[in-house]
Each structure stands twice: as C-alpha cells, then as structure tokens.
C-alpha cells in the first residue's frame, strides 16, 4: 500500500514537471520561425522592424491591446480550439496528453497573455538582437507562466492561500494598458523618424508620455474609472506606490520638454525618445550632441582627406535604440566627446533611411551567394555597404579608419564608456606616422 502511494506521488511529480516544461517549450517554439527568416536573409529583421507601415501597424495593434487591458473588450481565441485540445488530452493520456493540456492552457490564457506576447514580439523585432532577444523573451515569459502552474500542480493546497482575483488584477491590467499606450507612441515615433515626417519631435514624444502617465496617476488615485468597473476601487498601498512611482517618472520627464535640456537628457530612457537633435527647437546641428557629422560616405571621406584626420564611421539607424544609448550615454562622456569632436571626422550612415535615391543612383546588387537586391533607398545603400565591406548587419557598428580605407582598430559595437574610450585611444595611436600623431597623457 505504501509502495502504491509512493508510486502515485512520484508519477504526479513527474507529470507536474513535464507540464511546466511543456508550457516553457510551447512559448519558446513560437520564436523559431523568426530564426529561420533571419538565417535566410540576415537583414530581414532590420528591414521589418524599420518598415514605416509595419511600425504604424504595431502602433495600432498596441492601441488595440491597450483598450483590451482597459476592459472595453476581451481578446480570446476560439473556444472550439481549447475544447478540442482538452478532449484530445483526455483521450490520449501520457506525455502527449500532458503536452496537449499545456497547449490548452496557452490558448485559454490568451486573453491575458496575448497583448503581452504581441508587445514582446514587436519590441524584439525593433531591437538589434532580433530573433535571439525574442527567443529569450518568449522563454522567460513561458517560464514565468509555467512556474506557478507547476508549483500548484505539485502542491495543490497552495491554491487555498492565494488571494482571490478581482480588484488587484483589474488594476494591474489597466496599468499595463497605460504602458501599452506609451509603447504605441514609440512605434509611431519609429515610423516618423524613418520617414522624416517631423510629426513626433522629441519634445512632442515626451509630452505625450507625460500625459499618459498623468492619466495613469489619476486612475490610480481613483479620480476616474473605466466603464467595466462597477464601483470606485479602494486606495490601497499598491495603488499609492504605483501612483508615487509614476509621479516621480513624470517629474523626471518634464525637463526633457524644455529647450536646452542637455542638463537632463533623460539618460535612463536613452533610445526611447527621438534623438536630441530631432527637436521642435532650433538646433545648431542635425547630428548627435551637435557634432559636425557627414551623412554621405564619399563627402565625409573627402573632408577627412582634406583635413588629414582619421574617420569614425558610424553605422546607425533612426529607429536603433542601442545607437541612441551610445550617442547619449557614451559619446557624451567629456573625454570621448573631445576625441570625436577634435580628432576624428564623424560619418554617420543611417541604414534604415527610407528616403529614395535619385533614379540615376539606384542600382542592382548581386551578392556572392547569388542573391540579387535592388538598392533604391539611402538606407538600403548603406546597409549593403556595411554587409559587404564589414560583414555585419548589426547597429550600432563603429569603424576607425583612414581615408584610404586602412583600418585602425577592430570594429566596435554597443559597449560602455571605458571600453569605448580605450578603443578610440588604441585606434588613434595606430594612425600612420606620415599622418597626425596623438598623445593621451
């Protein structure tokens, strides 16, 4: 008898662990197609993430998700899917049955997880990590979902001690709705930057975020409620805490709307708002930190040759978050700023610029693999230039070189201040003896 109970308990433990494992596996597998796409054409995810109309689509999707969180409607997959899987799991049994139960959970919980997964997908496509970040995010999400279900399968008595869902769950969903609104603005901003519409300048973007989080503060303090909420919620510790954090965040944002706000460049948010030079206020330069930069390779090389200075070649993007982080958090370091400003010619090539090339400058490019690509925009030209000459499609990507193409240091990507500074010094110390020499004492 004891042996029988032990065997049943052991089987229950195994099934619970398998259940949790399959939940994680299902969400991880959802990212697999994006790795296949990326392996076929390594530039495809960057092309997708910076596509103007796709970013507008993501903007609309995030608005749709936000209003779902606000309770105006609920996102659900057809119940027939869940019912069929549930029937199949009961009929099949064993490992396959447990997998089908996990798949049933993924479908049934879609009304809560769908908007979050959509946000994760869109956010990952917009990052330089692409499919890898998506896989990590989906796996992490699956793990977070599987952990409590696995624990409850192991220890059913824990369910009795859980607080009942209700007010706190609704508050959390509404807060996520406001966050979705803020992220929606980010995708609209990507489209605006790439297309050069000039609609969402930096201060307008920050102003919209301020309005969104002020709205969230008002909701948390109970100044208004959404139609699906029957009664005014209780102002508990959780609501007060979230409201205070949101208020501090709004206070942090406000200086970013003012002219000459370099004293508060919102470094914690670097990469999310548009670049500082994309402003409603008059700027001395259309380059980061008011550098003198050149956005055409040939022109920049000619200038470097005429002034006898080495080149800092900057492969960047209008919608590149890590590019903004380097510009605002690394280049702003006084020592790095001085070296770039005084000792180098900065050439910034935007690989996601959708401005069409002049008809006579458009051409067809054939890769060594035999793949043929029509180069019709400025961004396509610089993306192909980077891929062919430097075997990379990631941004930011920095090259130190002489005007004749001599490389002064290995390429550098997204990194911290000490590493970037040392890289600059190493590159400048390798300038040929017949050219300029530098000292860093």
Stretch-by-stretch model annotation:
Residues 1-300, 307, 349:
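Hydrophobic alpha-helical segments characteristic of multipass inner/organellar membrane proteins
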């Amino acid at each position: 008898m004891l042996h029988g109970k032990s065997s049943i308990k052991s089987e229950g433990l195994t099934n619970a662990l398998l259940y949790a494992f399959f939940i994680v596996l299902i969400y991880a597998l959802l990212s697999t197609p994006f790795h296949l796409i990326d392996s076929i054409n390594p530039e495809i995810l960057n092309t997708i993430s910076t596509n103007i109309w796709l970013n507008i689509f993501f903007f609309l999707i995030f608005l749709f998700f936000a209003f779902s969180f606000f309770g105006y409607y609920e996102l659900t997959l057809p119940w027939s899917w869940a019912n069929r899987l549930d029937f199949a799991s009961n009929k099949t049994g064993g490992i396959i049955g447990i997998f089908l139960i996990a798949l049933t959970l993924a479908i049934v919980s879609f009304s809560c997880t769908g908007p979050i997964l959509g946000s994760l997908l869109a956010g990952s496509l917009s990052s330089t990590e692409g499919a890898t970040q998506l896989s990590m995010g989906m796996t992490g999400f699956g793990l977070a979902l599987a952990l409590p279900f696995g624990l409850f399968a192991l220890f059913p008595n824990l369910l009795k001690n859980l607080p009942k869902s209700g007010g706190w769950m609704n508050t959390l969903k509404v807060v996520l709705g406001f966050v979705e609104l803020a992220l929606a603005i980010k995708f609209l901003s990507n489209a605006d930057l790439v297309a050069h519409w000039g609609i969402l300048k930096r201060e307008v973007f920050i102003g919209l975020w301020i309005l969104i989080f002020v709205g969230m503060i008002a909701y948390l303090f109970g100044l208004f409620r959404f139609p699906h909420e029957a009664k005014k919620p209780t102002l508990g510790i959780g609501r007060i805490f979230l409201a205070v954090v949101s208020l501090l965040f709004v206070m942090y944002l406000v200086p970013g709307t003012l002219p000459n706000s370099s004293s508060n460049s919102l470094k914690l948010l670097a990469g999310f708002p548009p670049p500082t030079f994309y402003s409603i206020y008059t700027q001395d330069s259309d380059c980061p930190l008011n550098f003198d930069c050149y956005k055409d390779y040939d022109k920049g090389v000619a200038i470097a040759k005429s002034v006898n200075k080495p080149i800092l070649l900057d492969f960047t993007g209008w919608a590149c978050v890590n590019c903004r982080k380097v510009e605002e958090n690394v280049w702003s370091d006084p020592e790095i700023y001085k070296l770039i400003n005084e000792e180098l010619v900065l050439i910034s090539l935007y690989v996601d610029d959708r401005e069409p090339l002049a008809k006579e400058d458009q051409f067809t490019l054939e890769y060594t693999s035999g793949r043929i690509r029509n180069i019709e925009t400025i961004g396509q030209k610089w993306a192909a230039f980077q891929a062919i000459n430097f075997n990379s499609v990631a941004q930011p990507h920095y090259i130190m070189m002489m005007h004749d193409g001599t490389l002064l240091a290995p390429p550098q990507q997204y990194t911290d201040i000490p590493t970037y500074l040392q890289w600059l010094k190493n590159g400048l110390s390798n300038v040929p003896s017949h050219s300029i020499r530098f000292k860093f004492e």
